[in-house]
């Protein structure tokens, strides 16, 4: 039975809409939704969860915490043992923030699922989930939106032409990030400052000026990842418009730094590896 109340459609690339509707018609027992930062993975999960009347349980890190704990997963599993009159959908977001022990605790529920119970795991990187988890889930990978879609998101804004160009470059294909930058002047200003640092690193690699940009990122992993994201965007643009043999080694160093940061590596060493 469809939900009688309006359900918001997530902002998706055109190519992702048909797969989402197909999943909504026949929701799998366990689904991983992979969406890089700025894509609407959360919106896709919520759409699937509430399109049909359901009891929805949401699992996320507790306030001021960065991980989903084993105890949270066990509490959720205990709740699933109670009687349900409608289907149950458990949204775990971000799923990659489950500790390894928490993932192992979840595994039994995936191996022996309750009737009419569905798990939606939202993650930026499915490789951070245990292989045993991944093997028991279908996967929906979201893609970046088109330039035309991105431009439409900014049509109703009062941004200057320069701000529009900057946002469309820095957040290309990532609709949630586009909206955040368009609606939050402070955030846009922060991104502009990070972009200036990224430009300095790329134009004067190994210089004192490039090294001087880094200390403000050493104690802020999230900000360091933003810097890396912008560096990747800029290098990809350079490779497309002004190809050079120097680009690939630089791209490899940036990707290595990103991987280290996402696996809780030392921020200082990861960033210095790009510049030095």
Residue map of PLM features:
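Structural motif
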Residues: 32, 89-91, 120
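Glycine-/small-residue-rich active-site loops that bind phosphorylated ligands and cofactors
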Residues: 40, 64-65, 98, 219
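AAA+/P-loop NTPase substrate/partner-engagement loops
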Residues: 53-71, 129
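Helical "lid/switch" subdomain of P-loop NTPase nucleotide-binding domains
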Residues: 90, 94, 102, 125-129, ...
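Conserved catalytic/switch belt of AAA+ P-loop NTPases
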Residues: 104-121
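Charged, glycine-rich active-site and insertion segments that engage polyanionic ligands
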Residues: 1-39, 43-56, 115-116, 124-276
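Conserved alpha-helical scaffold flanking the Walker A/P-loop in AAA+ ATPase domains
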Residues: 19-23, 69-89, 96-97, 101-109
């Amino acid at each position: 039975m469809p939900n009688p109340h309006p359900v918001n459609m997530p902002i998706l690339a055109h190519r992702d809409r048909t797969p989402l509707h197909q999943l909504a018609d026949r929701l799998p027992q366990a689904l991983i939704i992979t969406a890089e930062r700025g894509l609407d993975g959360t919106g896709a999960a919520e759409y699937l969860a509430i399109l049909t009347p359901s009891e929805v349980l949401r699992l996320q890190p507790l306030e001021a915490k960065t991980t989903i704990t084993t105890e949270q997963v066990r509490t959720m599993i205990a709740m699933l043992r109670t009687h349900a009159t409608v289907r149950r959908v458990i949204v775990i977001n971000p799923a990659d923030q489950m500790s390894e022990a928490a993932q192992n605790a979840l595994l039994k529920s995936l191996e022996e699922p309750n009737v009419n119970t569905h798990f939606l795991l939202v993650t930026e990187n499915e490789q951070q989930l245990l292989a045993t988890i991944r093997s028991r889930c279908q996967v929906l990978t979201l893609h970046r939106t088109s330039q035309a879609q991105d431009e439409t998101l900014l049509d109703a804004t009062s941004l200057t032409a320069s701000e529009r160009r900057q946002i469309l470059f820095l957040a290309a294909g990532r609709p949630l990030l586009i909206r955040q930058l368009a609606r939050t002047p402070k955030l846009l200003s922060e991104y502009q400052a990070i972009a200036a640092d990224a430009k300095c690193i790329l134009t004067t690699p190994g210089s004192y000026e490039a090294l001087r940009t880094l200390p403000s990122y050493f104690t802020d992993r999230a900000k360091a990842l933003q810097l890396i994201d912008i560096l990747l965007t800029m290098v990809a643009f350079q490779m497309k418009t002004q190809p050079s043999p120097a680009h690939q080694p630089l791209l490899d160093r940036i990707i290595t730094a990103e991987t280290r940061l996402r696996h809780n590596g030392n921020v200082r060493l990861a960033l210095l590896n790009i510049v030095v």
